[in-house]
């Protein structure tokens, strides 16, 4: 069930344009389901079920209902045939970046499980978790995502480490991320060129009322600062800090130094800086100017 034999019996040549790499390792499949902490009230969205190895595990779990979305039409045919007898499973053909994310039986989806194609990781994270400037269309309580290890390390990175980036700031302001397990390339069929990692993401139930109001400014601030991640803050945003008393007070209060680099600043401090900037600065021609 869901292992090597199942994958081989389901005849389908992987398509590179869809980024198809099917997880075959039973241990990893079990860890994904365990991390989702499924109970009889849960309605799960599975992204890209492929040949159904993880789908079968989800159906066997305590989850109330599984709604899957698959883009590959040939796989859709095979999946419908394989799981046609399952009344707690429904399959929608479509692109996860644009398809409806609700369950076809009217239930509210509260959890997501996905083996993310590497080529759509960024856009999919935005759709499922939201953006600094825009709340997500659907609010999920837990997401268990299998993704490229390099990207996962950035989601999990702490300030001051080499992997901490603008993506780290964005995601950590929106959700709590937890490492589940590493997934070597040999766990897939066909094996990708890079390793993967499973991450559990729990979006915050409540967001600061000012969050989305300053989100656009925060995005521009992060882009501006992390474009020169090896540069000290005084060389990227120092000009408007030293000329703005309110921003200087914020730096002093939070213990931030212009000799620090962008990856050394915590997500909460980046948000606080954006709030202070919104009151005192505007962006003109890509640079920050005092009002």
Curated annotation (Swiss-Prot):
Pfam families: RrnaAD. S-adenosyl-L-methionine binds at residues 21, 23, 48, 70, 95, 115. Its EC number is 2.1.1.182. InterPro entries: KsgA/Erm (IPR001737), rRNA_Ade_diMease-like_C (IPR023165), rRNA_Ade_Mease_Trfase_CS (IPR020596), rRNA_Ade_methylase_Trfase_N (IPR020598), rRNA_adenine_dimethylase (IPR011530), SAM-dependent_MTases_sf (IPR029063). One of its GO terms (cellular component) is cytosol. It is found in: Cytoplasm. Specifically dimethylates two adjacent adenosines (A1518 and A1519) in the loop of a conserved hairpin near the 3'-end of 16S rRNA in the 30S particle. May play a critical role in biogenesis of 30S subunits. Belongs to the class I-like SAM-binding methyltransferase superfamily. rRNA adenine N(6)-methyltransferase family. RsmA subfamily. This is Ribosomal RNA small subunit methyltransferase A. It comes from Prochlorococcus marinus (strain NATL2A). The lineage of its organism: Bacteria, Bacillati, Cyanobacteriota, Cyanophyceae, Synechococcales. The gene is rsmA.
């Amino acid at each position: 069930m869901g292992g090597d034999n199942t994958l081989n019996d389901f005849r389908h040549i992987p398509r590179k344009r869809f980024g198809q790499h099917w997880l075959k390792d039973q241990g990893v499949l079990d860890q994904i389901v365990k991390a989702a902490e499924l109970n009889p009230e849960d309605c799960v969205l599975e992204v890209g079920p492929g040949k159904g190895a993880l789908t079968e595990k989800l159906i066997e779990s305590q989850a109330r209902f599984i709604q899957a979305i698959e883009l590959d039409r040939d796989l859709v045919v095979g999946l419908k045939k394989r799981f046609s007898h399952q009344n707690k499973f429904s399959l929608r053909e479509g692109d996860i970046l644009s398809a409806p994310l609700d369950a076809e039986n009217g239930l509210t989806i509260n959890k997501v499980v996905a083996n993310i194609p590497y080529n759509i990781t960024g856009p999919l994270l935005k759709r499922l978790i939201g953006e600094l400037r825009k709340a997500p269309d659907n609010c999920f309580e837990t997401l268990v995502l299998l993704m490229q290890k390099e990207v996962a390390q950035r989601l999990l990175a702490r300030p001051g480490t080499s992997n901490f980036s603008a993506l780290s700031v964005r995601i950590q302001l929106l959700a709590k991320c937890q490492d589940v397990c590493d997934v070597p390339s040999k766990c897939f069929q066909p094996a990708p060129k890079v390793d993967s990692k499973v991450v559990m993401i729990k979006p915050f139930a409540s967001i600061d009322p000012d969050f989305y109001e300053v989100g656009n400014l925060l995005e521009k601030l992060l882009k501006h600062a992390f474009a020169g991640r090896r540069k000290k803050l005084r060389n990227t945003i120092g000009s408007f800090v030293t000329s703005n008393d309110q921003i200087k007070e914020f730096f002093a209060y939070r213990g931030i130094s212009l000799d620090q680099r962008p990856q050394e600043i915590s997500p909460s401090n980046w948000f606080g800086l954006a709030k202070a900037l919104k009151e005192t600065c505007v962006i003109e021609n890509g640079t920050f100017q005092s009002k």
